Amino acid sequence: MIYLIILIIIAIIVIIFFLATGLYIFKSTVTRELHDIEKSYTRYVENNLFDEALYNSASKEDITLKSFDGLNLTSTLIMNENPTNKFIVLVHGVSICYVGSLKYFDIFYKNGFNVLIVNQRRHGKSEGKYSTYGFYEKYDVNMWIEYLKSRFGNDIILGLHGESMGAGTVMETIPLNDSIKFVIEDCGY
């Protein structure tokens, strides 16, 4: 009888340990604290991580689309000053929002691309309660691709660039859309 009681106590301790560990992992990944947009932007400017003058002078359009599960998702479309059918979709990592993609803006813009910088769900001005590390985000990126095709035509040259969680997301998007011509996966997870 004493062994049964000890076994039950050990089982309860193990269950509590696994529940606590699961809660910790959930809070530190799926609902982790997001970076402040203004502070991140200021840090990127101070560290010369992108050409702010070029970014500010470029023609920008804020776009909001409704995701398959009803969230308002935001992006900024930057049309190149030289007309082109080349588009790149920049997808940031977890917790940083669109600011994390600005360091790649110059490279693509100066090489003749129109640039769509997205705010993944739960980031920036996009709605959402959780980051799903590509599980739902891949459908969001596919939605942005379809938006670009519907607006600019099926003959656009379309690439994806993702960093960290964004890299995982763009890799998961590949099987969803045959229009993707290239993908840059930068440090997936």
Residue positions per predicted region:
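Alpha/beta-hydrolase active-site loop
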Residues: 131-152
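An N-terminal hydrophobic leader/cap segment in hydrolases
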Residues: 7-65
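Primarily recognizes the serine-hydrolase "nucleophile elbow" in alpha/beta-hydrolase
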Residues: 147-151, 155-189
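Alpha/beta-hydrolase
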Residues: 91, 120, 185-186
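Short beta-strand element of the alpha/beta-hydrolase
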Residues: 85-93
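A short loop-to-beta-strand scaffold at the N-terminal edge of the catalytic core in hydrolase folds
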Residues: 68-79
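Serine-hydrolase catalytic-loop signature spanning alpha/beta hydrolases and amidase-signature enzymes
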Residues: 95-103, 115
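Conserved alpha/beta-hydrolase
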Residues: 105-127
